[in-house]
């Protein structure tokens, strides 16, 4: 009892200030709940990572086909390169097109077969010796279980024999010195 009280007192002393602060935070949220939530949602919408994550739908296994964003233009919400702008009336514009460095996925997607359809060849163990086949028709000798208790009252000696064919049953065989007794049943 004394050990448990020594354990409970420090735990309560450490957790009570946090519980009090939690209640104060709940009261502040209820006062200006709508203003803070609107502000937080608007702030999250303008984060560039948020733009990039929501810009591309998930293509499953074909994510590598998406175009890459230029490393020096990390805040652009679209993944294409900007064409260079040359100032001056007689400047010659380059005649090449901006293309992404990775091609977009094709319209027809190849189906991915399930792993159960893949044929795996069996391993060849040439260095191991061949295991001889076991003859299941071979005769099995019965195991003799000795009697554990001595028999009193001059009854015949009984040995229990266990065979694999009758694994849960014990066959009882009598010794040759047994006597036969006739049993009559009363007629009802």
Swiss-Prot record:
Indicate which residues are glycosylated according to the record: 143, 148, 167, 184
Sites of Phosphoserine modification: 167, 185
What's a single GO BP term from this record?
A: protein stabilization
Q: Where are the residues marked Cleavage as a site?
A: 117-118
The protein's matches in InterPro entries, at most eight in alphabetical order, are given as: Casein_kappa
* Pfam families membership: Casein_kappa
Membrane in keyword set: no
The compartments listed are: Secreted
Could you list this entry's UniProt keywords, alphabetically sorted: Glycoprotein, Milk protein, Phosphoprotein, Secreted, Signal
Q: In which tissues is it expressed?
A: Mammary gland specific. Secreted in milk.
PTM annotation (Phosphothreonine): residues: 163
Its Gene Ontology cellular component terms are: extracellular space
Chief subcellular location equals: secreted
Q: Which residues form the signal peptide?
A: 1-21
Query: What does the function comment of this entry state?
Result: Kappa-casein stabilizes micelle formation, preventing casein precipitation in milk.
Record-stated family? Belongs to the kappa-casein family.
Protein name from the UniProt record: Kappa-casein
Name its species: Sus scrofa
Q: Which classification does the entry list for the species?
A: Eukaryota, Metazoa, Chordata, Craniata, Vertebrata
């Amino acid at each position: 009892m004394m050990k448990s009280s020594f354990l409970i007192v420090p735990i309560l002393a450490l957790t009570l200030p946090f519980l009090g602060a939690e209640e104060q935070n709940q009261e502040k949220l209820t006062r200006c709940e709508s203003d803070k939530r609107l502000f937080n949602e608007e702030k999250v919408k303008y984060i560039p990572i948020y733009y990039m994550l929501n810009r591309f739908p998930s293509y499953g296994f074909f994510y590598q086909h998406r175009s890459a964003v230029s490393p020096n233009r990390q805040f652009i919400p679209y993944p294409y390169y900007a064409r260079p702008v040359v100032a001056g009336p007689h400047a010659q514009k380059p005649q090449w097109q901006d293309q992404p460095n990775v091609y977009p996925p094709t319209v027809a997607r190849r189906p991915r077969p399930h792993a159960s359809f893949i044929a795996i060849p069996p391993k060849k163990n040439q260095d191991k010796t061949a295991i001889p086949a076991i003859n299941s028709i071979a005769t099995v000798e019965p195991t003799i279980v000795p009697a554990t208790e001595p028999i009193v009252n001059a009854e015949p000696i009984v040995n229990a024999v266990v065979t694999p064919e009758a694994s849960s049953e014990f066959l009882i065989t009598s010794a040759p010195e047994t006597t036969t007794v006739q049993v009559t049943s009363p007629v009802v």
